[in-house]
């Protein structure tokens, strides 16, 4: 039985000098900020989840504490599907996407953590998976006043030296010509055997995305992520049809219903989603299985804390995803939240075989990284 639900708003300020196109354009500039959810059962099990809503963590926290928590107290924590539906239906009139789903995401992941701990099995095995390693690509190439072309080349060369065979670079904040020069400089240093993807973070118009896509085709780019605003699915479908470079997205979509429309309209070639805001592990599994039926690869997105990274990893292992996204820029909410170190082996993330998520929250970490406001 669910005894208590606690939430913690956590902040890390150390990555503000590296920015994507949205931040450069003044549309989304926030510190790394997550909401961690802690669920305790009457028989002493504790599970953890993570939610992300840039700049809106207070609203996520209130949603969990004031709306979701009263629905869940004294419920059977093992009835995860029932509890997901109960939360979704209770927030239907004002939720369905965004903040409410981000809150549900953290709760759902925490419930799966508990389920694994009670069963003494890792989550990926509860989901039917067998994959012990998932190949990772590294997202970098953020814009920074401190990063000239030479430093950009050094950064990407470092990722390859560590054994990663795929990288992703931020674009969209500079002119197309400047971004193409950045990509050419990276290709020179990483060679032809490393996959290079790009991420525009939704900043282009359709016409701009089409023009940039034509340029990216000539460079052999692996995929073009979130070229335009997520809402313009018909236009994204036109891009996917007209461009040779695969369109990837849209991590900013929520739940199986929105992803059904994305796939039905063939708005992407590669599906990307994330446990921290699409509805948790339960919903991401539904999206992943739907992608299999409709012929799409699913590559999990990642950009926040350690709990969501490991949640994504378990789902990727269960779905046999070909890749998973990873970051290596300094982020204490990823690197210092667990007692154990996240295991990387020759460019792959190792799926933990310990119960639940398989990682232990470090004592005092929620107090240490508690947001100041």
Swiss-Prot record:
Induction: Expression is strongly increased by growth on D-arabinose, both at the mRNA and at the protein level. One of its GO terms (molecular function) is hydro-lyase activity. InterPro entries: Enolase-like_C_sf (IPR036849), Enolase-like_N (IPR029017), Enolase_C-like (IPR029065), Mandelate_racemase_C (IPR013342), Mandelate_racemase_N_dom (IPR013341), MR_MLE-like_enzyme (IPR053670), RHMD-like (IPR046945). Its EC number is 4.2.1.5. It comes from the Archaea. Pfam families: MR_MLE_C, MR_MLE_N. Optimum pH is 6.7. Keywords: Carbohydrate metabolism, Lyase, Magnesium, Metal-binding. Belongs to the mandelate racemase/muconate lactonizing enzyme family. NCBIfam families: AraD_Arch. Catalyzes the dehydration of D-arabinonate to 2-keto-3-deoxy-D-arabinonate. Participates in a pentose oxidation pathway that converts D-arabinonate to 2-oxoglutarate. This is Arabinonate dehydratase. It comes from Saccharolobus solfataricus (strain ATCC 35092 / DSM 1617 / JCM 11322 / P2). The lineage of its organism: Archaea, Thermoproteota, Thermoprotei, Sulfolobales, Sulfolobaceae.
